[in-house]
């Protein structure tokens, strides 16, 4: 049985940044372990993206969903730098000012680990105003966002650099390991996995979308109060490039909010 001060389940954005803060603020004196179902970023290879294969071979675990860096690592590496995109950070931390501080800090961390500095895109204010007016006329809202487009290849390098930084400060990465169950024994958490048991004084569960069902099950077992969040339902609408050209020229990955009657 391996023991830690803090155990983290899931090496996605939440788990990695939590480990980063513990490593930096604890100056390497806090014993941290991260249990991750997938593998290190450079080991994640999706057959769909391999020219010689080009199809899903049902890897277990899926390299897209699982692995160090989280589900977004093998996508385009696009980071939305705004508190109310992807969640309501300002509500969680209590103010817009604090939320912006955290957003800017996160961007600095990505740059520290090798994100190219010339990848930041800030939409032109004048063009944004024009699109906002057009959107308002049809009952929609255009949301301008600072975006950093790191790219897939750079994302893997950034995550690998961050992983190396954490390992040099004593953080253990327990990859290829699935967390199965959690018990609390004598004031310690006991995490049962496919590679044995791990114990810790503190436990952070950050299993991502892939582990959402398991997370709910464990939270209920441990008596953690849950608050359901809104459900995002996506609809794919394909249009000719000319239709979106004006908006795409201002925002690479535009966000438009439309409130319908039903």
Which residues make up each language-model segment?
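Residues forming the flavin
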Residues: 1-86, 126-262
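Dinucleotide-binding Rossmann-like beta1-alpha1 core, especially the glycine-rich loop
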Residues: 67-121
